[in-house]
């Protein structure tokens, strides 16, 4: 993770006679970070709201803080960050992705991509494209103390605004390296003797299958919303798990669970066994 910058409070902002307004280029820059290609080009991503900004500040290098005086006072700011104080009258929707934005935005440097490691239960998202689902899975992982969530090919960018918002600060604690080759990565860890579990519609019941302790190395693969786990990734899985539907319904049941809900059920049962 990035180094932690020194922080200090910014009481001097309330004494400024004039507000520093955003330039046209600054507005274009902030809006451009909504798209992945510009995040990669600028090596930066944006976070909105005092809660999320406050959670991310100790873990990512802050490049820029933009907000009203009240919002800026709610957080500490790194000494080397550019600070732009806006008047209450500024229409924050000009730079925000939110319908009802809180007038605070931070721009952070993208972190160096960590190497994939397995420490306890590790999640792998195979083509999970929906940003809301990816963010919710990161939040679920954080809740259960899972520190490693890998992003397989085709998964949503974790630094997109929707994923950042849905993760509710989990990116401060969960490391999500994108995998250059999902199959090769799984094959490598399989050779190290690490079991690879996968969530399928058909498999051994989660509630009957033997599971390793939560702290023991294991990989759990979650497939995309539409097609599930891809065939090439499925070939590397050692244990197939399924969440059985309730037998109480006599007229059938819904075809499948949302991937984020399935992740929460799987992680909860894994933790309960430990």
Regions inferred by a protein language model and the residue ranges of each:
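Short beta->alpha connector loops at strand-helix junctions that form conserved
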Residues: 86-88, 126, 152-153, 175, ...
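Structured adenosyl-cofactor binding patch, chiefly the S-adenosyl-L-methionine
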Residues: 106, 143, 158, 163-170, ...
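Active-site/ligand-binding-proximal alpha/beta "capping" segment
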Residues: 198-254
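RNA substrate-binding interface of SAM-dependent RNA methyltransferases
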Residues: 112-206
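Arg/Lys-rich RNA-binding interfaces used to dock onto structured RNA substrates
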Residues: 7-131, 271
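Amphipathic alpha-helical repeat scaffolds
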Residues: 49, 129-136, 255-262
């Amino acid at each position: 993770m990035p180094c932690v910058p020194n922080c200090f409070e910014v009481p001097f902002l309330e004494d400024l006679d004039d507000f520093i307004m955003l330039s046209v280029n600054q507005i274009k820059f902030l809006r451009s970070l909504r798209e992945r290609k510009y995040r990669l080009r600028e090596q930066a991503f944006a976070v909105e709201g005092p809660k999320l900004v406050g959670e991310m500040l100790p873990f990512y290098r802050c490049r820029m803080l933009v907000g009203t005086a009240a919002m800026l006072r709610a957080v500490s700011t790194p000494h080397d960050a550019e600070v732009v104080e806006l008047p209450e009258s500024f229409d924050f929707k000009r730079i925000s992705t939110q319908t009802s934005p809180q007038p605070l935005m931070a721009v952070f440097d993208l972190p160096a991509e960590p190497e994939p490691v397995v420490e306890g239960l590790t999640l792998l998202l195979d083509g999970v494209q929906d940003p809301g689902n990816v963010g919710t899975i990161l939040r679920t992982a954080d809740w259960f103390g899972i520190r490693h969530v890998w992003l397989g090919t085709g998964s949503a960018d974790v630094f997109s605004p929707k994923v950042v918002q849905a993760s509710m600060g989990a990116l401060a604690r969960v490391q999500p390296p994108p995998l250059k080759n999902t199959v090769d990565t799984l094959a490598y860890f399989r050779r190290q003797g690490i079991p690879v579990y996968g969530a399928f519609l058909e498999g051994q019941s989660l509630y009957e299958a033997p599971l390793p302790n939560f702290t023991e190395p294991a990989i759990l693969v979650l497939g995309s919303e539409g097609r599930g786990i891809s065939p090439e990734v499925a070939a590397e899985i050692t244990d197939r798990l399924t969440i059985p539907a309730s037998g109480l319904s006599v007229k059938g049941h819904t075809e499948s669970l949302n991937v984020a809900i399935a992740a929460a059920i799987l992680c909860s049962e894994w933790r309960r066994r430990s």
